[in-house]
């Protein structure tokens, strides 16, 4: 059984047009949303075998706020996750070591939303699937589960959406 979770980075600051996309920081709203997700993780006792994050500053700041709720789980920052493409995201997932059962990825849209939709079984809980399809807001958290035993077997419609949580709901 594999568990694949995603967080879209929290709301970033667009006030400085001279800052590169990779170097944009979190806005105050993004910091608050990240704290809400951190509190949710603590309350729900969320655990992950591995955590991977994009190297973009807004993703790094998002996971650094959440980090205290992750106990001793190491966070690995991967340039490959600074992507907006679901094919690149799936390639990254397929290379995860098989002894890792539960993964959290902090990244970007549309890659996260498209990956979740692509991997999700369309005959499952349509409410969760419809919500993800409608919008994957900043700082939203989603978990997918599958009976596959190797990450390289990850493919279309092989996962079920277990939960989809937005900070505004908490």
Q: Residue ranges of each PLM-predicted region?
A:
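Short, glycine/serine-rich, charged loops/turns that create anion-binding
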Residues: 11, 56-58, 110, 148, ...
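Functional cleft and adjacent loop/helix regions within the main domain
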Residues: 76, 82-84, 149-170
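Active-site-proximal alpha-helix that buttresses catalytic centers in soluble enzyme cores
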Residues: 2-84, 121, 136
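Glycine-rich phosphate-binding loop signature in dinucleotide/nucleotide-binding domains
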Residues: 44-46, 95-101
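Domain-level recognition of soluble alpha/beta enzyme cores
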Residues: 123-162
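Residue-level preference for the first positions of well-ordered beta-strands
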Residues: 4, 102-104, 141
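Short phosphate-binding loop-to-helix
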Residues: 81-98
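A glycine-rich beta-strand to alpha-helix segment
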Residues: 101-120
């Amino acid at each position: 059984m594999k568990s694949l979770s995603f967080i879209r980075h929290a709301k970033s600051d667009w006030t400085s047009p001279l800052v590169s996309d990779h170097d944009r920081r979190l806005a105050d709203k993004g910091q608050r949303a990240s704290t809400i997700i951190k509190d949710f993780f603590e309350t729900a006792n969320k655990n992950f075998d591995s955590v991977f994050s994009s190297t973009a500053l807004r993703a790094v700041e998002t996971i650094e706020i959440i980090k205290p709720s992750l106990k001793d789980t190491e966070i690995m920052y991967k340039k490959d996750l600074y992507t907006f493409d679901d094919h690149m995201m799936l390639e990254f997932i397929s290379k995860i070591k098989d002894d890792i059962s539960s993964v959290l990825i902090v990244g970007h849209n549309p890659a996260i939303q498209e990956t979740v939709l692509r991997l999700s079984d369309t005959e499952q809980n349509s409410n969760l699937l419809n919500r993800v399809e409608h919008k994957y807001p900043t700082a939203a958290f989603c978990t997918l589960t599958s009976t596959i035993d190797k990450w390289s077997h990850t493919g279309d419609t092989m996962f079920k959406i277990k939960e989809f949580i937005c900070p505004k709901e908490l």
